[in-house]
Design a protein with these regions (language model features):
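N-terminal glycine-rich phosphate-binding loop and ensuing alpha1 helix
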Residues: 2-49
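Short phosphate-binding loop-to-helix
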Residues: 47, 53-101
């Protein structure tokens, strides 16, 4: 059974722009979300999907696998669906990028 956790992360949120990079206790929110996921699965099974080069850069700095997706995705689920077209798995687990705890 092949699966991955996909963490969709959008930089241009309407209510809180840049939310995935918000500092929470010294770490960007997206890094905290990734760290929580890594407690239950191998880091090789986690991927951040984003339309933002800023988020991609932070992921690179923390050695988090990431992929740039279209800025036309309206929802996180749309972003996961785009990943599914590029990476073949049996299951895609969608963990929202604003779940740092």
């Amino acid at each position: 059974m092949k699966y991955i956790i996909v963490i969709p992360a959008r930089y241009k949120s309407k209510r809180l722009p840049g939310k995935p990079l918000a500092n929470i206790g010294g770490l960007p929110m997206i890094v905290r979300t990734y760290n929580q996921c890594s407690k239950v699965v191998s880091k090789s099974k986690i991927l951040v999907a984003t339309d933002s080069n800023k988020i991609k850069k932070v992921c690179d700095e923390y050695k988090i696998k990431s992929i740039i997706t279209s800025n036309k995705c309206l929802t996180g689920t749309d972003r996961v669906a785009e990943v599914a077209k590029k990476i073949k798995c049996n299951f895609y687990i969608n963990v929202q990028g604003d779940e740092p705890f």
